[in-house]
Every structure is written in structure tokens, then in C-alpha cells.
Amino acid sequence: MAKEDMIEVEGTVVETLPNAMFKVELENGHQVLATVSGKIRMHYIRILPGDKVTVELSPYDLTRGRITYRFK
């Protein structure tokens, strides 16, 4: 899948789950299950509940996503 096909939305981390998974509440009120992208994992960027993040969603499954950026 091409990167242009991904849907980028902002949200807030609600809960941390095992295996680097997070429950993220999007700005529109929906909750998605998100994992950490490789670059964030590689640079040891910590993500905690309450952090504002950018999530990439696939148009095929809008319930799962990938965290690509954590706002400071």
C-alpha cells in the first residue's frame, strides 16, 4: 500500500497496552488500537497516556493504526 493512501489523524493516548500497543482516542471521538512505528521505536521515544500523537490509519481497517509522531 502506498503511503499516500494512509489517513493521518491526531489523537490522544488513553491507555498503554502490552507489546507497544496503545489505545488512542481520535479528535472525532473514535478509539483505535495503535502500535508504534519503527522510527519511534528505534529512537526510544517514550509514549505515555495523555500524549498527543499523529496516527496513520489504513482505509481498509479503521480500528487499527500506527503512531508516527508524538507532539512535545
Swiss-Prot record:
It is found in: Cytoplasm. Keywords: Cytoplasm, Initiation factor, Protein biosynthesis, RNA-binding, rRNA-binding. The keyword rRNA-binding applies. One of its GO terms (cellular component) is cytosol. Signal peptide: none annotated. Transmembrane segments: none annotated. One of its GO terms (molecular function) is rRNA binding. Residues 1-72 form the S1-like domain. The keyword 4Fe-4S does not apply. PROSITE patterns: S1_IF1_TYPE. Belongs to the IF-1 family. Component of the 30S ribosomal translation pre-initiation complex which assembles on the 30S ribosome in the order IF-2 and IF-3, IF-1 and N-formylmethionyl-tRNA(fMet); mRNA recruitment can occur at any time during PIC assembly. One of the essential components for the initiation of protein synthesis. Stabilizes the binding of IF-2 and IF-3 on the 30S subunit to which N-formylmethionyl-tRNA(fMet) subsequently binds. Helps modulate mRNA selection, yielding the 30S pre-initiation complex (PIC). Upon addition of the 50S ribosomal subunit IF-1, IF-2 and IF-3 are released leaving the mature 70S translation initiation complex. This is Translation initiation factor IF-1.
